[in-house]
A protein has these predicted regions:
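Surface/interface-facing alpha-helical segments and adjacent flexible terminal/loop regions used
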Residues: 2-239
Length: 239
């Protein structure tokens, strides 16, 4: 995979103090966990009901809390997402808008799947935009990671283990358990998993649709936030 550059430092605008997952306070830990959980939800695809937090922009709160620490590109990314939210009148309207974009980008379109949600599809591409087969080495490695932690996918999940949302749920597990148990090994794995495993393929995933999708920018923007969060975690230095 192509080398993905991690930013050298993440500085607190109020004090120029380096931030990393090792130094986050409880409030920012909670915001990061909530942000990762929300991103996982988005890439599963939204349900027909229960989207009032998106309609009202409430879901942006953890991302707003993380902005001084993570840094987003473009900097006004949250304002653009907020503008999308306010352009709809009810939950059904915003659901239809996002569902159509989700299917068009990640499931099927006239010209095929624009950006598959599986890490295996971005390994050993023979040509730009060409997908590698499903259930490749990334899927096998994710299965091994789950087994090594005594985890398993629920019976209701019928996706390969390298689906983006599943990888985000695994990252959530590493962070939450690493912080709550004070487990240095899990925190270290969260850093390497975000920066070395997830970020390279998620950047390729983002590149697939960033210049193509013009009708709905929601997933362009949330994927930009995801990349920023992965860079932040992956660049964390041990104290």
């Amino acid at each position: 995979m192509d080398e993905v550059r991690l930013s050298d430092t993440h500085l607190n605008r109020q004090g120029d103090r380096m931030h990393s997952i090792y130094s986050l306070d409880k409030t920012n830990q909670a915001a990061l966990l909530e942000g990762v959980a929300l991103l996982s939800r988005f890439y599963w695809g939204l349900a027909a009901e229960g989207n009032r937090d998106i309609l009202q922009g409430i879901y942006l709160r953890p991302f707003e809390a993380l902005k001084p620490i993570v840094g987003y590109e473009p900097p006004d990314i949250l304002d653009e997402l907020r503008a999308i939210n306010t352009s709809f009148l009810d939950e059904d309207e915003i659901f239809q808008y996002l569902e159509q974009a989700y299917v068009r980008l990640f499931i099927n379109s006239r010209d095929g799947i624009t950006a598959p949600l599986y890490a295996s599809c971005y390994v050993a591409e023979s040509a730009p935009g060409e997908n590698a087969p499903l259930m490749g080495p990334p899927a096998a490695l994710m299965k091994e990671r789950f087994q090594s932690k005594g985890l398993s996918l629920g019976d209701h999940i019928h996706e390969p283990p390298d689906h983006l949302s599943i990888e985000l749920e695994y990252l959530y597990f590493l962070l939450e358990r690493g912080w709550s148990d004070g487990d240095a090994a899990l925190k270290d794995e969260a850093v390497s998993f975000a920066g070395q495993i997830m970020l390279p393929w998620v950047v390729r995933f983002q590149e697939r649709f960033v210049a193509i999708e013009t009708e709905c920018r929601f997933y362009q923007l949330t994927t930009a936030i995801l990349c920023a969060i992965l860079r932040f975690i992956g660049a964390s230095d041990k104290p």
